[in-house]
Structures are given as C-alpha cells and as structure tokens.
Amino acid sequence: MTTYYSGKPPIETGWIAWSQYFKEYGKNIDVFPEVDDTTGEPLKIKDMKISDIIGYKPIYSQILEKNDDLMVCEIMPSYVKKKTALTITADTIDEMCKGIENLCQTEKQSFIFAYCDNPDGIIHHTGCYSNETKEFIKETENRFTNLVEKLKGTNTLLLISADHGHHDTKEKISMLDLPEIQECLTMPPSLESRMISFNVKENKKDKFKQAFESRFKDKYKLFTKEELLQSHLLGYGKEHRKIDDFLGNFIAIAISDTTIILENYLRREIHGEDRKISTHCGLTQDEMEVPIIMFDLK
C-alpha cells in the first residue's frame, strides 16, 4: 500500500513487508498498525515513531505542491490513520462507492484515493475460490457497474486495481518445527511468511543454505541480500538507508503453495495458530499480478 501512498517503490521508502526488524526498538514491528509483532501491543514510545524512521511524503502532499487548487481526498476504513486533511471513512464497498460518487458530483477538480480491505480479508480467511469470495466479487462488480453508470458525464477517470494478488496455501510449516534452520540464526526471522528475511550466523551460512534448500528447494527461492537487491524485486531508485537493516543476509521467497509460518512460542500462546487459508508476498503469478481497470467517464 505504501507504494500507492507515496508513489515510490519499496527500495526507496523502506516499507518492504508487514513485519520488519527495527534495531531502534529491538524487535520486529508490524509497520502499518505499528504494533509489536509478537505481542500485538502498540508502540508507546513518544520520542521515536515509525514515521521518524521510515517516513515518506504522501502522494496527496506531492499533488498539492504542484496544484493547490485541487481537492485532494482519501476514502479509507475507520482504523486507517489519516494521511490528508480531507478523509472520508468507509468500512464497506457500498460506503466507499457512495463517497466516490458524492465527491465526483462536485465542480471542483479533485484527486480521490479510495481503499477497501476486502476482498483481501475475506480471501485470507476463506481462500481465493470460496463461496464467500465469489459472492463478494460478484457484489463488488455489480456495485462498481452502478458507480460507473452514475459517474458518466462527470469527466472522471476511474482506475481500479489492487496492491497485491493472493495464493491459497496447501501446506503450512511452522518455524518452530525447523530446528535445523533455527540453530543457524542470530535472531528471529522477519518480513512475511512468503518473503522471509533470515539473519544467519557467519559460521553457519553453508549449513543454513544446505538445510534450507534440502527442505524447500522447490518451494522457496533463496537469495543472498546482494542477489535480492540486484534482482530489483523491491523496485528501482535510491536505496533507503534502512534497507540494509531490514534485510538479513538471506531472503527466501515462496514459489509454491507451501508457506513457512513465522512464529515463536510466545506469539503462538498469544495469537494461536495461523489460520489463514490464502496469503501473498510470494513469487507465484497469482500473487505478483494485479488488474488495472480504467474507465474514462467524460
């Protein structure tokens, strides 16, 4: 989402995954909600916020710097932190579409960024091909069809897309069940279950690589930090100063329907077992490709 919010790739913003290790806090932090990844507790440090470390200029500010006559607005779920002065709360697709419709009826030129956390949430819990997912997609398609009809003649360019795809998981393996890999690490892994950053002991690099590839050779693609950066999977541009901190010396990215669950005993005790049926951040086509749908409603 940060690429949408900033107009820049992860390599430049430093926002590369859900949970990143911050040496400033000495722990893995879920960056969007700003909570401890293990306990789920919010950060309570006044003198050092996430935005102080990996802050960025929102696209709204960038637009207003070029043309302050525009009306710049975001439509977001109620739990999302505001990033611009004019923010409309919408917790459903209906509310989001209604907000777009109302704003587009005004005479003032505007830029509107709207986001809904479904179908992502539904797919996580029921899978890509569940009845719940199919029903939501059909209802959403109907709602957008109605929106397009209502926006005709308003000189609106409507773009519909997503921040990632999804892939159903058929095999889950907990880090707790991988002692041969755990013993090679200096600290808990981070980032995502399908894009994992490993900080490996210098004297255990060969053992780690052998252990990982013997178990996951056809399931994850293993990169060194240098190989990942050279691949430009994080995009092109000036490297953020924290990238070197956030990436371990090995990174594994899923290429199959196997997912390694990043958990420790405390996290499992607090949150229970991971129940996601579908997830993302791997290199499968389903996860990498997103649609871009455009309506030019003059």
For the regions a language model picked out, list residue spans one by one.
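Feature captures the catalytic ectodomains and active-site-proximal regions of enzymes
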Residues: 1-298
